[in-house]
Amino acid sequence: PTETQLKQELKQAESSKNAPNQAETTEALQSALNWLAERKESQTRSEQYQKVIDDFPKMTQELRRQLVLESNKILPNGDDLPAAELEQQILQTSSLLLEQARLLQQEQDHTREISDSLGQLPQQQTDARRALTEVQRRLQAQPANPTTPYAQAALALLQTEAAARKAKVDELELA
């Protein structure tokens, strides 16, 4: 079911105050909407991961080009510069080095976070696959054509949960 369909069904369920299982129906539909949102987030992250993967060769080529340009820069030797100008260059270089050291520390922290998360990735993948298998099993146990609003909402909930869990498995496979 789509987000629009679920929102319409939720409005109908909320307005049907005397319907049997009204609270459970609205809760199931709201949960289904939450699963759709989670699925959308996983798909967005998957797209971002894929973009990074696709852009990696171009990015590394650009970084290599910048490295060559930096290493080919000719620095003044300072023989013909006044002391005040040399001191100014030293201050600028020192400031630049401090900034680069700060950026390097940030990169090292980020690399450490990535390394830590990579260590957890196999377990996360296993857990996500297990959860997907479980929801698919529950989905297959549901009647194909539910007749009550609550049964329809429960089916929609399982369908959206299965879609969200599948998107999470796909996301973790790209990570």
Residue positions per predicted region:
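Flexible, low-complexity extramembrane segments of multi-pass membrane transporters/channels
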Residues: 1-175
